[in-house]
């Protein structure tokens, strides 16, 4: 498929012919050194586009080298990472029979055959004693293992090896032959990297198609690398409904296969054992499954919805556009630490990241977005200058309530809030999943109004948060959203955002939460470092800012017959409930 950019038509065949020749070798696909992983279902702008003239780029060879080495990106970095024998430390990656013959002759002469890892299947008969592997391996994994690499001059493994600080021997002439022409190739490595990444290449943001510089491209690839590397450990995924899998396919992809969902792949808990890892969406998994897995020596993590979830309700089967994966313990259960808690407690959050978090917070508030992307709308304070306090209802059988709710129900919350705020104008906002008719936690309005001044259903949570003075929550994410708007927050349970010096906490906060964090440090950990996000347009894993932009521009709406059916089912349940009450 061709892509027209700035009047220059580039397709895969023309790229190979124009820039790198037509020969395709292991790790040398004829494609640019920086390229996107083939995430399942992704349809995106190309990251790199060939142009007949060099685009100006402020990056230097040294800066590019540092970024590549830090991110371990370039080449097929999403390739497999098989266990490599320690005594097989000489990597041979020939591109032709001529190169293979030269390498084999040297290995035999130096009696190295039994130390050789031979990459590729075409030449396996030429060197008895060598261990042969496929050519789909992550080149950074190979280079990190090797004590020396012998490769053809067009093989990007040569550049990866040099960047890894390992000796590389070049056979033949080609793209990376300068690495074999001088002693001490680090002297010329910076220039070679600059030429490779900047000459006759432009970089495009795959989410927008706009120009981006090489360092930004490397940073994006490094984020994808971290995601893929985390996913490599997963042996099975349990409890994920079919309608959620379009999102999870990309966010749990390990570089070679779709996530190994237990139901579709026939995987069973009993087939897993010591050394395996599994992920569980606990609300849909068989009871006791995580405990059985852990007793069998299986490292078990949890999947849950992220904090900026979707345009629409999960109870209506709207797929999430954000998830969290946690191998320590789910973030809403204060009984044990979670990876989120450890980030908030211990992470070294840089000034740049704090600035990014502040920008993100301002964007979310300006767009009026909440967890379900509902937008701001309008809501006027009904009691003028009187103190207005929002009380947020929750799904009472939700795991966050059962784990961190400290036994407080929606009815308890309303009464406690009135006791603490005797003179305030109290607004009760029922949870949207409860209002949709799917979940537990409904309270008759007449009961609510014994303590609250108003039951508000139509205004969005963002509109309410913008206009109230304070918020009372059990564990609701609305408390975190209120903090981002500078509101006073009282927690009656133990949500993840309690205990960091930003809230008034009435629940029993774990003593291990000792850090005092700024609001933007909390935002950085909670919305940038911890979750995973999927762009609904390109289907690529994305930075949080991309998803926020899509939601703000109404580009994140998902529709399906199942969603329509669930919406109608909820409306029917709600109507029947009101009929029963009025009977």
Language model region names:
Residues 1-583:
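Catalytic-core helical/loop segments in enzymes performing group transfer/polymerization on anionic/lipid-linked
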């Amino acid at each position: 498929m061709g892509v027209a950019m700035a009047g220059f038509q580039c397709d895969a065949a023309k790229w190979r012919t124009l820039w790198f020749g037509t020969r395709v070798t292991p790790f040398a696909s004829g494609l640019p050194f920086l390229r996107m992983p083939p995430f399942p279902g992704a349809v995106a702008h190309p990251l790199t586009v060939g142009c007949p003239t060099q685009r100006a780029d402020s990056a230097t060879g040294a800066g590019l080298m540092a970024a590549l080495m830090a991110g371990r990106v370039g080449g097929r970095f999403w390739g497999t990472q098989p266990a490599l024998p320690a005594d097989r430390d000489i990597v041979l990656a020939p591109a032709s029979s001529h190169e293979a013959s030269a390498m084999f002759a040297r290995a035999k002469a130096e009696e190295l055959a039994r130390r050789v890892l031979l990459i590729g299947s075409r030449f396996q008969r030429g060197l008895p004693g060598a261990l042969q592997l496929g050519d789909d391996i992550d080149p950074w994994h190979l280079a990190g293992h090797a004590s020396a690499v012998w490769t053809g001059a067009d093989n990007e493994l040569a550049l990866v090896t040099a960047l890894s600080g390992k000796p590389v021997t070049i056979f033949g002439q080609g793209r990376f032959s300068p690495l074999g022409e001088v002693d001490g190739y680090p002297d010329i490595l910076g220039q070679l990297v600059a030429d490779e990444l900047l000459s006759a290449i432009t970089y495009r943001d795959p989410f927008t198609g706009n120009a981006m510089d090489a360092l930004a491209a490397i940073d994006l690839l490094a984020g994808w690398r971290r995601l893929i590397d985390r996913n490599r450990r997963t042996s099975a995924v349990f409890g994920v409904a079919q309608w959620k899998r379009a999102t999870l396919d990309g966010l749990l992809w390990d570089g070679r296969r779709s996530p190994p969902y237990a139901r579709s792949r026939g995987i069973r808990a009993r087939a897993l054992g010591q050394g395996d890892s599994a992920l569980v969406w606990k609300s849909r998994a068989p009871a006791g499954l995580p405990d059985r897995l852990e007793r069998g020596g299986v490292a078990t993590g949890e999947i849950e919805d992220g904090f900026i979830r979707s345009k629409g309700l999960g109870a209506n089967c709207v797929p999430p556009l954000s998830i969290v994966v946690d191998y320590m313990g789910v973030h809403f259960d204060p009984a044990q630490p979670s990876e989120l808690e450890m980030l908030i407690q211990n992470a070294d959050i840089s000034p740049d990241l704090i600035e990014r978090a502040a920008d993100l917070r301002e964007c979310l508030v300006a767009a009026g977005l909440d967890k379900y992307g509902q937008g701001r709308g309008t809501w006027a304070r009904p009691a003028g200058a009187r103190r207005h306090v929002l009380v947020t209802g929750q799904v009472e059988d939700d795991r966050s309530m059962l784990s961190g709710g400290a036994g407080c129900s929606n009815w308890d919350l309303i009464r406690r809030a009135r006791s603490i705020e005797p003179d305030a104008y109290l607004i009760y906002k029922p949870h949207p999943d409860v209002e949709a008719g799917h979940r537990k936690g409904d309270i008759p309005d007449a009961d609510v109004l014994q303590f609250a001044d108003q039951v508000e259903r139509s205004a969005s949570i963002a509109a309410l948060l913008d206009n109230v003075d304070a918020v009372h929550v059990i564990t609701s994410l609305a408390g975190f959203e209120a903090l981002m708007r500078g509101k006073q927050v009282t927690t009656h349970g133990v949500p993840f955002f309690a205990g960091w010096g930003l809230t008034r906490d009435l629940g029993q906060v774990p003593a291990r939460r000792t850090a005092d964090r700024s609001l933007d440090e909390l935002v950085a950990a909670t919305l940038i470092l911890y979750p995973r996000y999927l762009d609904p347009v390109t289907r690529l894993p994305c930075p949080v800012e991309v998803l926020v932009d899509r939601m703000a521009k109404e580009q994140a709406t998902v529709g399906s017959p199942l969603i329509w059916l669930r919406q109608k089912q909820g409306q029917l349940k709600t109507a029947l409930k009101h009929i029963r009450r009025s009977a």
